[in-house]
């Protein structure tokens, strides 16, 4: 999450909403298939923070933690109250897949391009870069990408 403003953001006003899809790319337990994760803390102006699962093993540095259950085909929205502020993934009416039918967010490091400095209420693929995380070098690649891309705005 990036705070593009010149004032500190109160993250307790926000939450992450994940539309949950299973391995077979069908909605999990509709209509209760949206997971809402409340955020907390403050985010300084022009600062970024990484959200990770409480039990994450590859990335364990500080950041927001929670029960982020994400298998790569789930659209994620940053919500303030009832309003979508930012969106990652395709239309939440279907799983987020590549043209080959693979989960689009699986085993990749997704980050918004540094030239994009505003959120989008709809997913715009051209605003994002994805770098594959191969199983044999996931930790090293992830550490290098985080160092390279976060705090560079």
What would you call each of these model-derived segments?
Residues 6-26:
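Short acidic, flexible loop segments centered on an aromatic residue
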Residues 6, 23, 55-58, 117:
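Solvent-exposed loop/turn segments at secondary-structure junctions
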Residues 22-34, 120-126:
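Acidic Ser/Thr/Pro-rich low-complexity disordered segments
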Residues 142-153:
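Primarily marks secretory-pathway-exposed extracellular/lumenal segments that are disulfide-
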Residues 1-5:
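Asparagine-centered strand-capping/turn motif at beta-strand->loop junctions
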Residues 65-144:
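Conserved beta-structured recognition patch
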Residues 26, 31-96:
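Secretome/extracellular-domain signature
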Residues 19, 52, 113-116:
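Structured segments of extracytoplasmic/periplasmic soluble domains
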